[in-house]
Each structure stands twice: as C-alpha cells, then as structure tokens.
C-alpha cells in the first residue's frame, strides 16, 4: 500500500484509531507472564491476534466480548490485563488499569511516556517498560483503519 493510500484512508477514518496487533508482537512479553494466570484482552473485537497468539502458546486469555473495559473492576475473574488500547484513550486505559490494582501490559507508542499528567501518574504509581527493538508495522497482513 502506498503512503498516499495510507494518508487517504487515515483521512476518511480520522475518528477511528483502531490498529490490529500483529500476533508476533506478543512474543517478547510471554517470558514475563505466568501460564497459570488468566489474562484479559480489553479491546478484543471480532478477531484478535493477541487472543489467538496467547492461545497458540498455551496461555489463558479471555476477550472483552463487547464488554466496556471501563466497567471492569478489581474483583473480575482475571489476573491481569494485556491489550493494545485505542491511542486516543490511552490515558483513560492507564488510569483504569492502575485503579483496578492488577498487573497490566499496554502496547503503546514510546511517546506515551511523555506528558506532565502521564509522567506524574508513572511517578506516583510506578511503571516498567518493555521497549521493542523494532518498529511494529500495523499495516502488514492486517486491516487497519488508516
């Protein structure tokens, strides 16, 4: 797909920042996770490569099934959250993950570490980062909104 086509698609879908995570992008995370735990993919829609990737490697993960992530509470039956949130809602996702008090991993751009509000949140609540040594290409073999 040409750069011009990407820009045109982005312009027609400006209200949507939906990007499907390539399945192989969960691999670096797996060594930090316990196979005896159940994880929640908060943005799994009709298909989720995060769900299929975890399943393929023998991890227990459940999708949202259309449930609004912001209705989730600490007592829900999962041990941690793993998701690629809509970038326009990354602050809300971060705050809600911290409020639930469960471990979480969010796929976010490195620039998400910046900002006074987020910086303060990370300083107060703590954070760890797993930085990939490659740039994730959300446009290869997947349908994106841009």
Protein language model regions, located:
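Class I S-adenosyl-L-methionine-dependent methyltransferase catalytic core
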Residues: 1-146
């Amino acid at each position: 797909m040409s750069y011009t086509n990407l820009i045109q698609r982005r312009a027609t879908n400006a209200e949507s920042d939906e990007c499907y995570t390539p399945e192989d992008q969960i691999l670096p995370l797996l060594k930090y996770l316990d196979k005896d735990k159940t994880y929640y993919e908060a943005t799994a829609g009709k298909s989720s490569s995060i769900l299929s990737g975890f399943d393929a490697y023998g991890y227990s993960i459940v999708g949202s099934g259309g449930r609004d992530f912001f209705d989730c509470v600490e007592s829900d039956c999962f041990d941690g959250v793993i998701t690629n949130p809509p970038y326009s809602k990354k602050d809300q996702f971060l705050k809600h993950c911290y409020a639930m008090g469960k471990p979480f991993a969010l796929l976010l751009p490195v620039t998400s570490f910046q900002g006074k509000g987020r910086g303060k949140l990370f300083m107060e609540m703590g954070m760890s980062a797993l930085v990939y040594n490659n740039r994730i290409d959300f446009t290869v073999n997947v349908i994106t909104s841009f």
